[in-house]
């Protein structure tokens, strides 16, 4: 199992900080949805018909017990109590509110999970 080192943690934490700012700019109207789209896709965030969806990578298809607990926490706290495992070894949360996405991503980052490189677009 791949274990994150300090470089990985710093990279993911910085991405979360950047995305938090980008979400604030989107919510304030400073960014249009078209301008926001490539920024959210870089972080595994898709706009569905009724809500945003967050796709999280499962590193090498393996989860630690701490990571599984964090996924459960995110499902309970930010979604509707469940997630969807994909055929590409990712998990999707389909009902996270845009304003809560940065907090969910920060929680996931503490467990070494993120949505980078999960966008097929």
Task: Indicate where each model-derived feature is located.
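Feature of Fe-S/electron-transfer and energy-metabolism proteins
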Residues: 1-121
């Amino acid at each position: 199992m791949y274990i994150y080192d300090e470089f990985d943690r710093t990279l993911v934490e910085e991405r979360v900080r950047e995305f938090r700012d980008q979400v604030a700019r989107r919510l304030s109207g400073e960014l249009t949805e078209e301008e926001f789209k490539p920024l959210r896709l870089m972080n595994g965030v898709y706009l569905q018909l009724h809500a945003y969806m967050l796709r999280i990578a499962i590193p090498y298809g393996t989860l630690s017990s701490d990571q599984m607990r964090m996924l459960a926490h995110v499902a309970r706290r930010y979604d509707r109590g469940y997630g969807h495992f994909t055929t590409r070894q990712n998990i999707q949360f389909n009902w996270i509110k845009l304003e809560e996405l940065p907090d969910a991503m920060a929680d996931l980052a503490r467990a070494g999970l993120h949505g980078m490189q999960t966008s097929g677009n």
